[in-house]
Design a protein with these regions (language model features):
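Hydrophobic small-molecule pocket/channel-lining residues, especially in calycin-type beta-barrels
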Residues: 1-157
Length: 157
């Protein structure tokens, strides 16, 4: 695997995404994600913003991604919807040379006004200047179901 797989994520990424869930109408969005290194720390700060085709804000989240050991990853995420996620998982290199980070929630926190979310899974795949991801979610009475997919291109280092 790359000496520091987190370094492969550093920069700003943009591209289109698609969302669906059994309780909502499918939708598309434009996304900007930024991963910023914290000097001297094995961690990246994370920010994400999505907009509609007309440029209206849809969703945002922020957090931190870090490695804990050679192939272990941890991710914490906070959303303005009142949902927080704590994830653990693995970082590995697949046969093509891409780095894959598989994460599953170990805790989902909810404010009193947040919609019910009981579990979240995230998979990130970094292959050069392309970042793809998949998000699954168990929420509002549904079991773990695919929710979001996107393919982003690096726009800055």
């Amino acid at each position: 695997m790359a000496e520091n797989p987190l370094a492969l994520l550093e920069g700003t990424w943009q591209g289109p995404g698609h969302g669906s869930y059994p309780t909502i109408v499918p939708f598309t969005y434009d996304e900007t994600v930024t991963f910023t290194a914290l000097p001297g720390k094995p961690v990246l700060a994370y920010t994400q913003r999505t907009t509609s085709a007309m440029g209206l804000p849809l969703h945002a989240e922020s957090g931190y991604l870090r490695l804990s050991g050679e192939d272990r990853a941890e991710f914490v995420v906070a959303q303005p919807t009142g949902v927080t996620e704590t994830h653990t998982g693995t970082a590995r290199q697949d046969p093509s040379g891409a780095v894959v980070i598989d994460l599953h929630s170990t805790n989902v926190g909810l404010t009193p006004g947040a919609k019910e979310v009981s579990a979240v899974t995230r998979r990130l795949r970094i292959d050069g200047d392309e970042l793809t991801y998949e998000v699954g979610m168990a929420a509002v009475g549904q079991t773990d179901t695919a929710h979001l997919t996107a393919t982003l291109r690096r726009v800055t280092d």
